[in-house]
A protein has these predicted regions:
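ATP/NTP phosphate-donor binding region
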Residues: 1-86
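A glycine/threonine-rich phosphate-anchoring loop and its flanking beta-alpha core
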Residues: 9, 104-197
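Electropositive phosphate-/nucleotide-binding environments in soluble metabolic enzymes
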Residues: 11-19, 42, 46, 69, ...
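Short glycine/serine/threonine-rich phosphate/pyrophosphate-binding segments
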Residues: 18, 41-45, 69, 94-101, ...
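Alpha-helical scaffold segments in soluble metabolic enzymes
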Residues: 20-24, 47, 74, 101, ...
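A short, small-residue-rich loop immediately preceding and capping a beta-strand
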Residues: 79-102, 106-115
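Active-site segments that bind and position negatively charged phosphate/pyrophosphate groups
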Residues: 189-266
Length: 266
């Protein structure tokens, strides 16, 4: 059997890491197109916008709530008109998936900046596409992972704790799905079987959350960045991302996809 493991090009995490965004974007060209959640545009971007603009020209466009084919097409037109050299997604999971899909449509590099640690989507070569009404439509499997994933732990610590807890719940399933795939010889997102590395990372993700999750929750409730919170952010984002993508998916994700058809789950 052949196993395949895939990774993002670069993972950066730490307190006020968003101040590094401009330097990372400049590695790809002189103009960056920022796809942002409306909250990010109003409340968070002013914190680090000056540092970004010191390195590259930026074009900012708010994201319209759903990662749909229609939204990706709309944004791709604007990115092309701006002659941007890199797409940057800043916000929650759907905004980030939209940025990945938009960059893929144009063959551009993409930088992913999650503002919450609620999912393991940021590191993956995958966008989950919904209808404009928010019903799961399909997985868009991309040819490569994001070029850069940049996580500002200060921003994550200031977000409502329910987002961190959602990420913990998501990440806890990673080990069980990877284990189920190993036992059944099921393929991962590449179609090959998962590697030993992916399974170990999925297990380490589970262990990290059990050891540090409670303290990380308290840290987030107090809006304070602590070593425990940093570890859980990394587990929710990087370890879970590598674990699900290269370890494989099972019943947990299938259940989620079906639940999106129920209006009360949105």
């Amino acid at each position: 059997m052949i196993s395949t493991t895939i990774f993002p090009g670069r993972y950066i995490q730490g307190y006020e890491a968003t101040k590094r965004l401009g330097k990372e974007a400049a590695r790809f060209g002189d103009t960056a197109f920022l796809i942002v959640d409306p909250f990010v545009n109003e409340q968070l971007l002013p914190r680090f916008q000056a540092e970004v603009e010191a390195e590259v020209k930026i074009v900012i466009e708010p994201f319209n709530s759903e990662c749909s084919d229609e939204e990706i097409e709309r944004l791709a037109v604007q990115v092309k008109e701006a002659d941007a050299k890199v797409v940057v997604g800043i916000g929650g999971g759907k905004a980030l998936d939209t940025a990945k899909g938009t960059a893929h449509a144009l063959g551009l590099p993409v930088i992913i900046v999650p503002t919450i640690a609620s999912t393991d989507a940021p590191t993956s070569a995958l966008s989950v596409v919904y209808t404009p009404e928010g019903v799961f439509k399909r997985y868009l499997v991309l040819p490569k992972n994001p070029d850069v994933v940049l996580v500002d732990s200060r921003i994550v610590a200031e977000a409502p704790v329910r987002f961190l807890l959602a990420g913990i719940g998501d990440a806890l399933s990673t080990w069980f799905e990877a284990d189920a795939c190993e036992r059944s010889y099921a393929g991962n997102m590449t179609g090959d079987v998962g590697s030993m590395t992916a399974r170990r990372l999925a297990g380490f993700c589970y262990e990290t959350i059990l050891e540090y999750g409670l303290v990380a929750k308290a840290s987030c409730e107090a809006n304070v960045v602590t070593p425990a919170l940093e570890r859980v952010i990394e587990a929710n984002t990087l370890l879970s991302g590598l674990g699900f993508e290269s370890g494989g998916l099972a019943a947990c994700h299938a259940s989620h996809n079906g639940l999106t058809a129920l209006e009360d789950t949105h």
